[in-house]
Amino acid sequence: MEEFNSSGSVVNGTGSTEVPQSNAEVIRGQIFEVGPRYIKLAYIGEGAYGMVVSADDTLTNQRVAIKKISPFEHQTYCQRTLREITILTRFKHENIIDIRDILRVDSIDQMRDVYIVQCLMETDLYKLLKTQRLSNDHICYFLYQILRGLKYIHSANVLHRDLKPSNLLLNKTCDLKICDFGLARIADPEHDHTGFLTEYVATRWYRAPEIMLNSKGYTKSIDIWSVGCILAEMLSNRPIFPGKHYLDQLNHILGVLGSPSRDDLECIINEKARNYLESLPFKPNVPWAKLFPNADALALDLLGKMLTFNPHKRIPVEEALAHPYLEQYYDPGDEPVAEVPFRINMENDDISRDALKSLIFEETLKFKERQPDNAP
């Protein structure tokens, strides 16, 4: 087994920088205006609203990842970009991806793209699980790092809401960093999340049952459910609840956990959803050891505490870290929390695209002001 190191991240950004055209490189038809500091660009991949390249940082002599985001034509992309920048420029934790630098033009009117510079990670858990089975040691270490990062996120009063294998970045020394905070929210049990299900369909498999049954009342336990799904996937190399649609997803969950008890049904505040569940024929639960016959017994014990139908009975992140399965890594003195909880309003659903653009511009400006080195 490889030696596990903790990668110290050098955060030495220059902030928002005006980028002249002469400092541009073209990667697969996309212009990257990130010179002269960032050179030798190489394609990594692309998502819905941006391309990612690796580059040499001439200031730190490190290889970094640069994400080019062109969000301003779409409301949703603007919202996600703003959330990501707002959160990640304030978070500082070994198991959460950092923002080292942000580049954009100096004029808001001319701002078409934003370049976000981050720590370079070689792969992600989704890709890793496609290619190899993990040893129990690797599963244990990855799970510990996920929960260590999540403890920090939850201590900041933030829900990630989109934890899944492709949002867990890995490097060669098995360091893990949580990324993609585009769907994150302040933890507010009264917030109505009705638009969430339509906002991002691809992550249905990792959604807690209460998300599909209630429009509000979400707590930090929705992220714990997602971590449970990820642990199950690490144990078997396949998703535990691969629902094809909303009802199929629910049936997959009930097919494993069994029918919810009368007590558990009480946590469903949507009467229609509760009546539907009560109308279903009784289903027994499937023992975890039958589903995962080769898994460590302690891993399955923790899995059962995370994949609990009732969110009020689901294990909180602090207790999960203290579980005997993670005993070899557990160190409360080295599991930092956020210095202050988030008080910034991230509910930007009703803000116009132009206003979102202004807020993104302002956030990049604030980031520059917080940097120790403000030299251009």
From Swiss-Prot:
Listed cofactors: Mg(2+)
Catalytic activity, as annotated: L-seryl-[protein] + ATP = O-phospho-L-seryl-[protein] + ADP + H(+); L-threonyl-[protein] + ATP = O-phospho-L-threonyl-[protein] + ADP + H(+)
Disruption phenotype: Embryonic wound healing defects. RNAi-mediated knockdown in the prothoracic gland (PG) delays the onset of pupariation by prolonging the L3 larval stage and increases adult weight.
Protein name stated in the entry: Mitogen-activated protein kinase ERK-A
GO molecular function: ATP binding; DNA-binding transcription factor binding; MAP kinase activity; protein kinase binding; protein serine kinase activity; protein serine/threonine kinase activity
InterPro entries: Kinase-like_dom_sf, MAP_kinase, MAP_kinase_CS, MAPK_ERK1/2, Prot_kinase_dom, Protein_kinase_ATP_BS, Ser/Thr_kinase_AS
One of the GO BP terms on file: R7 cell fate commitment
Function in brief: Serine/threonine kinase which acts as an essential component of the MAP kinase signal transduction pathway to regulate proliferation, differentiation and effect cell fate decisions in various tissues. Required downstream of phl/Raf in the sev/sevenless, tor/torso, and EGF receptor homolog Egfr signal transduction pathways. Required for embryonic epithelial tissue repair. During larval development, mediates Ptth/tor signaling leading to the production of ecdysone, a hormone required for the initiation of metamorphosis.
Residues with Phosphothreonine modification: T198
Entry binding sites for ATP: I44, G45, E46, G47, A48, Y49, G50, M51, V52, K67
Family (UniProt): Belongs to the protein kinase superfamily. CMGC Ser/Thr protein kinase family. MAP kinase subfamily.
Domain of life (superkingdom): Eukaryota
Modified residues (Phosphotyrosine): Y200
Domain Protein kinase span(s) in chain numbering: 38-326
Keywords: ATP-binding, Cell cycle, Cytoplasm, Kinase, Nucleotide-binding, Nucleus, Phosphoprotein, Serine/threonine-protein kinase, Transferase
